[in-house]
Regions:
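Short, flexible, glycine/charge-rich loop motifs used to bind or transfer phosphoryl groups or to couple energy/partner
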Residues: 10, 52-55, 105
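Short, glycine/charge-rich flexible loops or terminal/linker lids adjacent to PRPP-binding catalytic cores
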Residues: 16-63, 129-136
Length: 137
C-alpha cells in the first residue's frame, strides 16, 4: 500500500489527475460504503481485504493502476475486481519492478490488460544474490 503511493502521486501530477489508493484494512479515514476484495499476498503470506471508498471511484472514472512491485498478480486481480465493481474502466497498469519469473505480468497481459514495467526481473539467485533483468539476457 504505502510504497506505491509516492510513485502514484508523481504519475498523477504528471498527468494532472487525482490519486485514489486502496487500503489493506478498514481505517478511521475511510467512512461510509466501500468496494472491497480479498487478496492473498505472496510476499507476506496472508490474505487481506483491499478497500476503496465508493465516494472516490465510480463509473465515469478511467483508472491507471500504479504499483511498486508485481509478483504473481494477485494484488492486481483484487484491484481489478474492485474497479470492475465500481463500473470504472481500467486503461492500464504501471509497475516499477515486475518479478517476471512469477508470471503475474504475463498472465494479465494475456488477458488484455496493458501492463508496462520499468524493470522486469527474470531470475533471482538466493545463493549468489545475482539478479537477471529481462534486457540482460
Amino acid at each position: 500500500e504505502a510504497p506505491g503511493i509516492g510513485i502514484a502521486c508523481i504519475v498523477a501530477q504528471s498527468f494532472g489527475v487525482p490519486v485514489v489508493f486502496a487500503k489493506k484494512s478498514q481505517s478511521k479515514n475511510i467512512a461510509g460504503e466501500v468496494y472491497s476484495s480479498k487478496v492473498e499476498s505472496y510476499t507476506h503470506g496472508r490474505i487481506f481485504d483491499i478497500i476503496v471508498s465508493k465516494k472516490f471511484l465510480g463509473p465515469e472514472d478511467k483508472i491507471l493502476i500504479i504499483d511498486d512491485f508485481m509478483a504473481n498478480g494477485a494484488a492486481m486481480d483484487g484491484l481489478l475486481e474492485v474497479i470492475k465493481e465500481s463500473g470504472a474502466q481500467v486503461v492500464g497498469a504501471g509497475i516499477i519492478i515486475e518479478k517476471g519469473f512469477q508470471g503475474g505480468g504475463e498472465r494479465l497481459r494475456s488477458q488484455g490488460l496493458r501492463v508496462e514495467s520499468l524493470a522486469i526481473v527474470d531470475e533471482m539467485n538466493d545463493k549468489t544474490g545475482e539478479i537477471v533483468f529481462r534486457d540482460d539476457k
